[in-house]
């Protein structure tokens, strides 16, 4: 085909996707299947129904004030008597979808978490009305206590006491990354020329951000081995022993291989931190952790060293809500590193944050993240919008109260059926991997062609064209959009398909189309007398 992939070599996979979509959409009367983006086509409905029902209760609460005025004017919610009024609302509307969940939520908050029910309801009502600035700006008080219960249970398996964790509510995982990188630079914890270890393959911005001129960091790749279930070998993880490596970035479970770190890898990192690198900073993005079986975050094994980024986007189908948190242990090496800065650097930071409090040096790193997110001077208006925080709380309560994990198991079964369907039509079983999460599949062209027609054919097929050329051919001839694995730092010729954003019959179509292309290549191979 006429498309020259080389001219697009510097584009990120997500920008390249737009070019692939143009090609895939270029023929009339053909359905374009975009398996390139991870936006799920499923979502949690119960906590959304609860959100809208809560909004109606909140509006009624507001109208308890200024009822003598023109219709449509309300006031701030009143704490006194709110629990009784809410229970009457639940009793009167129990037959409506979402209301029963709200009643259970109040019971769980009061009876299981031991929180003040009136304070919870007042924060939720005030929050959903969006009538006040977020106070505290880092996260609403009761909301933080609830959401951190969810984070600790899902990401750390309860290994970290919830009370030892601080949260910063942010506009999704992407905002979290932007805030963290910028505050690390501003604070002097990362400086130009510093080495950063990056688990590869990885979400592309983790490759691109350190290369920006404002950071100018030296990347040290920590390669996952595709022939060992996409795990980091001991030799690769041992690169973290280098004292010049300041921070380790990773996505766990990985993107795009979609594999969680196994116990050996976690134990290796724990040992390195304990024995050689107690000063190592770790940043882990664990957005896919809820799709894994018995997931354990680096935050659970190295809590003092780790900033945990979690987004509600994938598990709850909430990419448009922009909901995420940054979690930090209250006793962490980021704060310790600030205390070890040279006096000149401390004085510069004293000046930067002087408007926030008298004793700037007591300001924790996570609170500096909040201030830096609004260039310090606007710290008093920082924070995630309160309606967003309310929806985050309802998502968290939905998961916490689902003791049988019915929602989680339904999603796991859904995406795993999709993977099985794709590979069935491709003519092979999916690779067995006990640590696989299956949110994405990295279709390894070399592995697929080898399994279908042998090693000799595989070597020939890979030499015929680049992965990019192959992906453009797939888009042009089949209308299917896959993203190149190399754009995520993979060394293997491969295409990433999301298993979350299409329906099962569409994954069957993808598998058949890829098999057809492989068969056509094999016919060319045979015609050359190479069989």
Swiss-Prot record:
Residue stretches in coiled coil: none
PROSITE patterns (alphabetical): AA_TRANSFER_CLASS_1
Transmembrane segment boundaries: none
Cofactor(s) essential for the protein: pyridoxal 5'-phosphate
InterPro entries: Aminotransferase_I/II_large, Aspartate_4-decarboxylase, AspAT/PAT-like, NHTrfase_class1_PyrdxlP-BS, PyrdxlP-dep_Trfase, PyrdxlP-dep_Trfase_major, PyrdxlP-dep_Trfase_small
MF terms in GO: aspartate 4-decarboxylase activity; identical protein binding; L-aspartate:2-oxoglutarate aminotransferase activity; pyridoxal phosphate binding
Influence of temperature on activity: Optimum temperature is 45 degrees Celsius.
Entry binding sites for L-aspartate: 114, 255, 496
Enzyme Commission number: 2.6.1.1, 4.1.1.12
Organism domain of life: Bacteria
Modulation of this protein's activity: Inhibited by 10 mM Co(2+), Mn(2+) and Ni(2+), and by 1 mM Cu(2+) and Hg(2+).
Catalytic activity: L-aspartate + H(+) = L-alanine + CO2; L-aspartate + 2-oxoglutarate = oxaloacetate + L-glutamate
BP GO annotations: alanine biosynthetic process; aspartate metabolic process
Keyword Glycoprotein among UniProt keywords: no
Job of this protein: Bifunctional enzyme that has both L-aspartate decarboxylase and transaminase activity. Has high activity with L-aspartate, and much lower activity with D-aspartate, L-lysine and L-glutamine.
Subunit structure: Homododecamer.
Protein family (similarity comment): Belongs to the class-I pyridoxal-phosphate-dependent aminotransferase family.
Protein name, per record: Bifunctional aspartate aminotransferase and L-aspartate beta-decarboxylase
